[in-house]
């Protein structure tokens, strides 16, 4: 009788661009302005199971540039990966989904965002490297604080 293989499995099935948009709502007038725009970048990570042992990790970015209160351009992007993760201890799953997987997907997102901005006629916006471990630990700490601050109901 063959034994079931219980070796840990962690591998990439696919990395893909899930969504990408570039908006220039105030063009062409805003392009004549010589001021340097302000840049705001927001990032997010989402993980969800898609099948037994398969997880989709999506890293999202929004890059919003403004001159005064007028938008120069806004990019919204979602880069995703499908990962096979099996036979991993449950206490290690959060770190894999929140740190290891986003670290693999993020460089693809950075490249796609820089490319679409340049194709839109703008100088590239280079998104910095992200410490996903620090981001994950901060989210975990915030979740712990939220549960500890929840009102206690005594029965």
From Swiss-Prot:
One of its GO terms (biological process) is protein tetramerization. The keyword Transport applies. One of its GO terms (molecular function) is unfolded protein binding. Keywords: Chaperone, Cytoplasm, Protein transport, Translocation, Transport. It comes from the Bacteria. It is found in: Cytoplasm. GO terms for cellular component: cytoplasm. Gene3D superfamilies: SecB-like. Disulfide bonds: none annotated. InterPro entries: SecB, SecB-like_sf. Homotetramer, a dimer of dimers. One homotetramer interacts with 1 SecA dimer. One of the proteins required for the normal export of preproteins out of the cell cytoplasm. It is a molecular chaperone that binds to a subset of precursor proteins, maintaining them in a translocation-competent state. It also specifically binds to its receptor SecA. Belongs to the SecB family. This is Protein-export protein SecB 1. It comes from Polaromonas naphthalenivorans (strain CJ2). The gene is secB1.
